[in-house]
């Protein structure tokens, strides 16, 4: 690969005072001065500062792989949280910025496919980018590597320590660095999967307090369902709550099941993200028509719990319409061959949450029905 940086003055490369953007811009100007054909430098990559890499194309886009935070670990190792930063070549200073965040829980993988596809499409169509996109694929890399929901060394739920503290313990320091990096964005989407026990349809969850501001954005995301929670049930130490409190609009998107990737759900949310980016003036490419989600509050949701232990065998499909009295499933006893409990719908509606993991105990959540009783 031809590298245009080879022809740049040495001080441009070594002087850390020179901004990354200036370095990229200087490279482009130099290449144009010598009439270098665009095909000879489709990608220019160089380590200019620490772990930051720059890549550009002649289509007018720039992306940067950046460290958000880096902390020391035992045995001479480091944990690094990275982001992929996309911006248009000709910056005006008025660009809108969107942040896509996922992987706060190490066992939630649905967002990995979304990040991959989003980065792939942006890389191939940077000339259609008119705003700034920051993508954070793994906020809890240790949890993802060890297949654990929490941060394994600290045994902490990472989504329960925000906004963190720059001078606090390691986990708090990490949380504060993430907050500082995202803060100020025009919109942030925090992508989650369910846990390993439940399967969820693509949905956005927001609080009653933030609904007036966030609901218009949520309706653009091509989800099936928007759940407006009571403010009493909102956990204040989450990333989304902390960012919203700081003035950065943040949506929580949830879909699928833990430790799995549902491609159809990922594609659905991707269409919504590009639609939202287009509506905000960040993306100028074509977008697909999005669905109109059902909007509901806590009062419209019914919870179905198990009364006994055993193996749950559903008799309905996920996201299926049911009527009051319909057979939802059975709880079986494999040892005796008996049906311990037959479960019937207490009301009519749509099943938007369904038990995925078969083993249940008394009080286990089996389903949630949109409809209310």
Give the positions of each predicted feature.
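Low-complexity proline/serine/threonine-rich segments in eukaryotic and viral proteins
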Residues: 23, 35-40
């Amino acid at each position: 690969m031809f590298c245009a940086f080879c022809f740049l003055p040495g001080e441009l490369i070594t002087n850390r005072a020179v901004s990354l953007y200036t370095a990229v811009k200087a490279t482009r100007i130099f290449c144009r001065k010598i009439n270098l054909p665009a095909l000879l430098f489709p990608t220019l990559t160089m380590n200019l500062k620490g772990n930051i890499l720059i890549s550009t194309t002649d289509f007018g886009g720039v992306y940067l792989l950046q460290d958000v935070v880096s902390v020391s670990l035992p045995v001479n190792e480091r944990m690094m949280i990275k982001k992929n930063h996309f911006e248009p070549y000709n910056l005006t200073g008025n660009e809108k910025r969107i942040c896509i965040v996922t992987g706060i829980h190490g066992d939630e993988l649905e967002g990995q496919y979304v990040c991959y596809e989003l980065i792939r499409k942006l890389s191939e169509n940077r000339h259609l980018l008119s705003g700034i996109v920051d993508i954070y694929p793994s906020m809890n890399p240790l949890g993802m590597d060890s297949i654990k929901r929490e941060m394994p060394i600290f045994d902490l739920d990472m989504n329960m320590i925000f906004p963190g503290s720059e001078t606090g313990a390691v986990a708090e320091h990490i949380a504060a660095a993430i907050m500082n990096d995202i803060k100020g964005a025009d919109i942030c989407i925090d992508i989650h999967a369910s846990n390993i026990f439940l399967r969820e349809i693509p949905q956005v969850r927001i609080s009653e307090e933030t609904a007036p501001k966030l609901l218009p954005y949520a309706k653009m995301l091509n989800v099936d369902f928007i759940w407006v929670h009571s403010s009493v049930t909102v956990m204040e130490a989450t990333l989304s709550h902390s960012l919203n409190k700081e003035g950065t609009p943040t949506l929580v998107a949830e879909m699928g099941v833990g430790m799995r990737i549902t491609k159809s759900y990922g594609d659905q949310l991707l269409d919504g993200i590009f639609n939202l980016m287009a509506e905000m003036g960040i993306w100028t490419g074509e977008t697909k028509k999005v669905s109109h989600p059902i909007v509901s509050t806590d009062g419209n949701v019914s919870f179905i719990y198990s009364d006994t232990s055993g193996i749950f065998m559903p008799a309905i499909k996920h996201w299926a319409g049911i009527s009051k009295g319909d057979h939802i499933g059975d709880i079986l006893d494999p040892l005796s061959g008996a049906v311990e409990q037959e479960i019937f719908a207490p009301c009519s509606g749509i099943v938007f949450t369904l038990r995925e993991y078969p083993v249940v105990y008394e009080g286990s959540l089996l389903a949630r029905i949109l409809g209310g009783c």
